Amino acid sequence: MGLAHYFQGQFAEAAESFRQALALAQNNDSVIDCSNWLYVSLRRAGKTAEATQALRRITPDVKNKEPHLLFYLRLEHFYQGALTEQAVLPPKPADPNDTEAELAFDTVTYGVGNWHLYNGDAKGAAELFRQVAKGNAWNAWGFVGSEVELKRLDPTQR
C-alpha cells in the first residue's frame, strides 16, 4: 500500500504504511527497503526531522543480501551525507538491454532526482527524471516514479 499511496502523492499515508512495514522488518534487506521509502515519503510530506530519524537503522555496518538493495543503501548513505551525488549516481547504461545496469541507473537517478525535488530544485529533478524516462526499465520503481514526477511537474505532458 505504501507505494500506491506514494505514487498518488499521498505522502503522509505512504509514510504510515512504510513505518508499519519497517516495524515488521526482520532482516537488513527489509530495513533498507522500508527505510528508503519511509525517508522519501516523509521528506515529500515536509517532515524532514522525522525523515532523518527514519534512517537511524542505516549505519555504515549495515549490509544487504539482495543485489538491487545496494542501490537503496547507497541512496540512504547519500541522504545521510556520507556519499556525494557524483559518487552515488551510476553511469547511463551503454547497453539498453543490460537490465541490471538499467535498474541501477533508474533507481538511483530517480532517488537523486527526488532529493533535488524536495530540496527545491525542480529543474534539476526534472532533468534527472527525463534521463530515467528515456530508458527501457519500465517495470522499475525509479522509472515509474520518474514518469509520475514529470507529469506532476508539467501536467500538460503525456
Functional labels for PLM-detected ranges:
Residues A25, V62-K63, N136:
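Alpha-helical junction/boundary sensor with strong preference for TPR arrays
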Residues L3, V40-L42, N114, E147-V148, ...:
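Residue-level recognition of tetratricopeptide repeat
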Residues K63-A101:
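Alpha-helical adaptor scaffolds
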Residues S35-W37, T109, G142, E147:
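TPR repeat positional signature
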